[in-house]
Amino acid sequence: MEESDEPEQPISLGRQEYRRRRLPSQPMVDKSQQTEIGEKKKGMAAVQPPAPKATHSIGNIPGGKANYSGKEYESLILSSQLQQTWMKRKQGQEMTDKSFQTDTSVEEKVEVIFMDKALEENSASVGEIAPASPQGVSEVEIPTSRPPSLLIDRAQQTSCTGDWSLISICSKDKVDKEQQTYFSELETTVKSMPGSSLIKSKEETVPIAEDGSLVEIDGSLEIEVLSTEKIPDVVMSFTEGEISGELQAVPDDEATVKAEHFFTEETSIQAPSLAKETSAAETTAKTPKEFVDIQALPADELSSTEPPADIRPPLVKGTLSEEPSDQQYPKGTVVAPSELPVEDLVPLSEEVLEKVQALAIDTILDDSGRAESTTVEEATGEVQPPLSEEITKEVPAEVHLPIATHSKEIVIIIDKEFAIDEDFEDQPPFITEVAEDEATAEVQPPSAEDAPEEVAPSEVLPPPTEQGTVEHMTAEVLSPSTEVGPAEVPPLPTEEWPLPPVTEESPAEVTPPETEEGPIEPAEEGPEDGLLLPTEEIPSEVQPPSLEKVPLEEVVIPQAEEVPLDDLPIEVQPLPAENIAGWVPDEFQAFPVDEYPAREDTVEVQPSSLESAPIEESSVEAQLLAAEADTAEIEETPTEVAPAEDQLLPAEEVVLKVEVATAWSPLSELPPAEEATVEAQLTSVEESLKRTSVDVQPPPLDTLAEESPAVKQPLKTDVVPMPEFPGEEMTAQDPLPPSVKTTVDQDLLKEHQLPEIADISQVKLEYTTFTGDKKSKGTDSVPEDVTGIKDDQISTFKIEGTIKIELKNSTS
């Protein structure tokens, strides 16, 4: 019985266990996690009947019992296996679900990682397939930098949906933008490629073929976009070199359009900042667009306008990029390296220009012997770009900003006031037709390009601005002064003139006269001689002809030359006024006094021709007298301006000199409150001006000193203050030793520097008061106001003036 009981017990137990396990096996199958419970039940079954367990193990051996036991065992095994299989299946299903999620996300991440590799591979393949391999490679490089960041960012945000949405959207964008920009295509192809990373090879081959075809078809357009985007993003000299090459490969129209778009972007960016600073900057921001439009139209008109348009875009590249970069540099001085490579681009673009100009010259020859003007432009443009580079290196940011703005505004004014067509009619008819549009565009882009050199044209414009646009000059002087700030503000009224001269040092100063003469009267002589000679001989040659031809322009030149001091003060602001007075005064007083007297003679010619300009200067003189104490510190720089003002207002000069001699010590005591504040600026600004002027101006002063006799001779007849000028020269020669001469020179210097200082405060006030009045009153009314201002400022500025003047006198 025991035996029977024993087997029954295990059978019954086995059945019970089987049933038990069988019933829960269903929910266990449903609930895959209950496998552990089943195993526990196995353990429980074995534990509950310990004896039957042994019998069960023994029963496995016997046959009859082994059936049940074997079945039960198999059932147990099957149940466990089924449970495990169900678990695996469910887990597999879950894994599949998760694989779509997590696995795809991981794969997508890997794809993103591969995207860079794929892009690199594509770049190599595209470089092979694409006609322009370096362009394709660079293009691929750009998207590699951008799209992976986007994909990685969105991959971090959303594992699957973000990337897939990107991929789908990218495919759509790809379809939409393939024809538009090759860069977007690269982005879309790169993104779409990770979309199907498993099929990378296929997709890679496909987009490569697409890229090749696209490059072949729209290579120019694609290259354009890439060039424009690459420069602002990377600002790499390598990319710039490629850009120049791309521009060369790209048709002239496209190249011009590229340069236009690129510069419009930069200029628009820079112009808004300037527009924020001044309405004049707004006009400049508008003008570059207008010029770009004008250039685009000439680019379309390859025959007549294209050479200047081509010349402009490349030159404008160098210049605009330089100027905008300069403008941006003062703002965000980071882009400096880009400016240098851009300058490097300028010669490359010049070569491209030469080629394009040669082609355009052929078309122009067909049009009407316009190749001459083009050659003149080429010579001027070619000669100028290096000058622009040098000048930009010397005084890039500060000079270019006011020059670009003023030159642009002046260009508009020149179009209105000066018949550029007439001026260029003297030049080949090519400029005559394109005169207004391209003359403005050429003058401005060059001004933007060479800002110093063709800032000479811009100066040419500023002198006309002095003549016809003295109103604009007043308004611009106010706005540029607001742009530049108090330190630059005084120079800005003169900056329009001095910026180019400062940038070009003396030849640039001379260049404006010739460019003035060139664009205004002798367009042919101006651009060729003015641009080529300005660096070398123009000071002497240009000024005499400019005095003979256009005393106003020449007057503008002396002003511009005088203003270099103002312009220099901008850069030179950091330099202490005392140091400047120490080492600069001798050079400045000696040279500027000798040179600028002639200039002032020319300036006197200006007063005669441009009463408004003398009025401004007279108002500036009033301010100068008021700030003469300060100018005593800045004697060096003011000596240049002072002779001009003294010559402008001989009566005032006598009065000013007498007042200076009599009240010079009080004037030294009298730095006007405005000048006191402005002096601090001017001291720093003028100190920098003095150093820069000593560096920059002394050569122009030497050349101008040579020119001054010629200029003096023609102007002496017109200029009453010429006797004062020799006195000034004597003071300039003995500026510091003789107290009287030093006072006169210091007064003159003060007057010149005060035009900077007082030009900031009083010139603005006087611009507000005299803008309408100066034009009507002329220089005579200004002396009255100047004397009144002198008296007022003398009384107000005694304390500060004495301190500063004493320091400078001690230093000098």
Swiss-Prot record:
Residues 1-66, 269-333, 367-388, 424-547, 672-741 are annotated as: Disordered. It comes from the Eukaryota. GO terms for biological process: negative regulation of protein sumoylation. One of its GO terms (molecular function) is calcium ion binding. Residues 514-528 have a biased composition (Acidic residues). One of its GO terms (cellular component) is sperm principal piece. Residues 275-286, 502-513 have a biased composition (Low complexity). Residues 488-501 have a biased composition (Pro residues). It is found in: Cell projection, Cilium, Flagellum. Keywords: Calcium, Cell projection, Cilium, Flagellum, Phosphoprotein. The modification Phosphoserine is found at S25, S57, S125, S133, S184, S273. InterPro entries: FSCB (IPR043375). The keyword Calcium applies. The keyword Mitochondrion does not apply. Interacts with CABYR. May be involved in the later stages of fibrous sheath biogenesis. Binds calcium. This is Fibrous sheath CABYR-binding protein. The gene is Fscb.
